[in-house]
Amino acid sequence: MIISSTNDYREAARRRVPPFMFHYADGGSFSERTLERNVTDLADLALRQRVLKDMSQLDTEIELFGEKLAMPAVLAPVGACGMYARRGEVQAAQAAENKGIPFTLSTVSICPIEEVTAAIKRPMWFQLYVLKDRGFMKHVLERAKAAGCSTLVFTVDMPTPGARYRDRHSGMSGDYKEIRRALQAVTHPFWAWDVGIKGKPHTLGNVSAYTGKAVGLDDYVVWLGENFDPSISWKDLEWIRDFWDGPMVIKGILDPEDAKDAVRFGADGIVVSNHGGRQLDGALSSARALPSIADAVKGDIKILADSGIRNGLDIVRMLALGADATMLGRAFVYALGAAGKAGVENMLDIFKKEMHVAMTLTSNQKISDITRDALVDLSKL
């Protein structure tokens, strides 16, 4: 099929990846209203077209936490990413490196930290959940540190699992899930060969290394459910701040007061995020939450944003709302599931070209030029 957008990659991934994995990435929580609004609230923002400005020296590069990025985007942490392509985390990390941006490895990745870092030269980022098992947290932080991970992304919006009803329908969870997955694999032969057979082991590499036994997909949901910690507070993060030498980013901020708390805590960055609509359905979209957060803490802390970004225009919109950079999740997973490393590289090329178009036609030559002036206030029309 012809590929020219994230939507095309989504459709290609839907055809190639079995439903239990496709819908795990594609779905949200409850009725998926926040998932929907993440996309529509961002896409509905009108860009302010300006013309007859010299855009011949247009530049999408930025510096973030001492790293140079070819564009203001980071590949976000996605659990079980290695189930979308053979050793998928490695392929995605290599694609990000080739295109000049960081890759973030999830705590619950298929490929362990050491396998991914051995495959790339650029230091990757590492994401950590708040878990009851502090021994695991310390263990995995030590490994990330030893492997040269540059930035820690600490996810704080999962003190409890979200109610992801679609997973029960798709076979990711629910009755007879093993049989349903096996039948789905039979009807998706390319995936069954490339990932199902040649992509083994299908265990959570970082968790298995700690427990000393294989922790697979069936154990994944149970292990996470048992280890989410609803008692977590800012005080519990202090030992992590003391232990981690590099930049620390708090992911899952939707309220200005929480953003101010992150500044007081000493975090280097925040990610304005609702977990892609996978946690609290009914929460604000990131596009709606971002402006007030930027008003509260812009300049005091680096602001990243995710959830709902489907093209390069959306990146420009997030920057105009106050973000310093963005994180891309579903978009790269669709591309990875559809075409592996080459798909992710092509998707990033598409996003960069779309950014060039948006920046040229809004007359913003550098990323630092993009402000809310790049948007049209439709309420005044």
UniProtKB/Swiss-Prot annotation:
Major localization class: membrane
Protein name: L-lactate dehydrogenase
Boundaries of every FMN hydroxy acid dehydrogenase domain copy: 1-380
NCBIfam families, per the entry: L_lactate_LldD, PRK11197.1
Cross-referenced PANTHER family: L-LACTATE DEHYDROGENASE, S -2-HYDROXY-ACID OXIDASE-RELATED
Organism in which the protein naturally occurs: Actinobacillus pleuropneumoniae serotype 3 (strain JL03)
Recorded topology in the membrane: Peripheral membrane protein
Gene3D superfamilies the UniProt entry points to: Aldolase class I
Keywords from the named record: Cell inner membrane, Cell membrane, Flavoprotein, FMN, Membrane, Oxidoreductase
Catalytic residues as annotated in Swiss-Prot or TrEMBL: 275 (proton acceptor)
Taxonomic lineage: Bacteria, Pseudomonadati, Pseudomonadota, Gammaproteobacteria, Pasteurellales
Chain residues that bind substrate: 24, 129, 164, 278
